[in-house]
């Protein structure tokens, strides 16, 4: 935010020019993913065949954003995930996706640039109908287990 002094008031005024510029959902963006890259999987085996069994997360398990973790174990960079600077020291988790119940699906796509970061990571979300689940909910439902525990 930029502080300026409105004429004659002597008090600073803040313009809405904050450093964090979130990319909102639009015709081209959904949940920070490029809509042209979105894929939906109702079959776990087809998802795993395309992208492997592992996911990871930067942030508490109460969050809904996961990322593909290549089988090599080399995770996407912070910059490719286009996360805001406040997530820099958040905890890191690795998961294996082991089941996908009937009526659930996996949505995946490529992160768009934001916060002056390039994007490009493959983001993954688990949906129950139209409802996006948190990592914690996925663990409780047996969809995800800690990597190496499955």
Name every feature range the model reports, one short phrase each.
Residues 5-150:
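Catalytic toxin/effector domains delivered as secreted proteins or via bacterial secretion systems
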């Amino acid at each position: 935010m930029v502080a300026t002094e409105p004429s004659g008031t002597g008090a600073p005024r803040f313009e809405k020019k904050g450093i964090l510029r979130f990319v909102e959902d639009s015709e081209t963006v959904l949940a920070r993913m490029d809509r042209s890259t979105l894929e939906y999987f109702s079959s776990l085996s087809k998802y795993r065949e395309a992208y492997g069994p592992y996911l990871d997360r930067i942030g508490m398990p109460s969050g809904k954003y996961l990322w593909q973790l290549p089988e090599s174990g080399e995770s996407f960079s912070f910059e490719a995930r286009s996360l805001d600077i406040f997530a820099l020291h958040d905890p890191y988790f690795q998961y294996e996706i082991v089941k996908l119940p009937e009526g659930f699906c996996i949505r995946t796509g490529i992160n768009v640039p934001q916060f002056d970061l390039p994007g490009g990571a493959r983001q993954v979300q688990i949906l129950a109908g139209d409802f996006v689940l948190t990592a914690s909910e996925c663990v409780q439902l047996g969809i995800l287990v800690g990597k190496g525990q499955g």
